A protein has these predicted regions:
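Active-site and NAD+-binding cores of ADP-ribose-processing enzymes
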Residues: 1-22, 53-186
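Extended catalytic/binding region for NAD+/ADP-ribose chemistry, centered on the ART fold
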Residues: 23-55
Length: 186
């Protein structure tokens, strides 16, 4: 998911703009990041629907009309910190303490991303973090570190794209949201 504006693509890393997130921003200067979802539903839930209550609500055009989705293909194996399953147990934490928290905990959770970034070994270190999406917990979410994952490491798939502000993609969003008690205002 990305904002479809001049100069932005699905493979563009955020250089440190915007409000704090679960795993960004850290470092001085900030390490650029790219968030991604394993499925389109997870990506939508983690972005467009992120701030709506679990019980539903209204989604306004300014919240989705400039948003697009694309699929990314990795050109090399990425090394990711596993903040899910037994990865959490190895770190002696639970999802409720790290990946299933409210935004009030972001100043604390971002430190885990910084710690993953600080891991160094003969291969250079970790490329990002993987966890179960809080908003769609049957799919993984990812944050990639822009100083480790370069432009040659990601490819935008040519067989998938959505632009949520119009046509069939808006209809898809309306259908998905309706099942969640969310009214998409057009």
């Amino acid at each position: 998911m990305f904002t479809a504006r001049a100069g932005r693509t699905a493979a563009s890393f955020n250089p440190g703009w915007g409000a704090p997130t679960r795993f960004a921003f850290f470092g001085e200067p900030p390490v650029p990041v790219l968030y991604a979802g394993e499925t389109e539903e997870a990506a939508v839930a983690e972005t467009i629907l992120h701030d709506l209550p679990a019980g539903g609500g209204d989604l306004y055009p300014e919240d989705y009309r400039d948003t697009a989705a694309a699929a990314l293909v990795t050109r090399r194996a990425l090394r990711l910190a596993a903040l899910h399953g037994l990865g959490l147990r190895r770190l002696a934490v639970t999802a409720a303490q790290l990946t299933d928290t409210s935004s009030a905990e972001y100043p604390r959770t971002v430190a885990w991303s910084g710690a993953a970034h600080a891991v160094r070994d003969d291969d250079g270190g970790l490329d990002g973090v993987c966890w179960m999406s809080r908003q769609c917990n049957n799919a993984k979410a990812y944050v990639l570190f822009g100083d480790r994952v370069g432009p040659d490491d990601l490819e935008i798939a040519t067989d998938y794209a959505r632009i949520f502000g119009v046509g069939a993609d808006l209809d898809w969003l309306i259908d998905l949201a309706a099942g969640l008690g969310i009214n998409v205002m057009v």
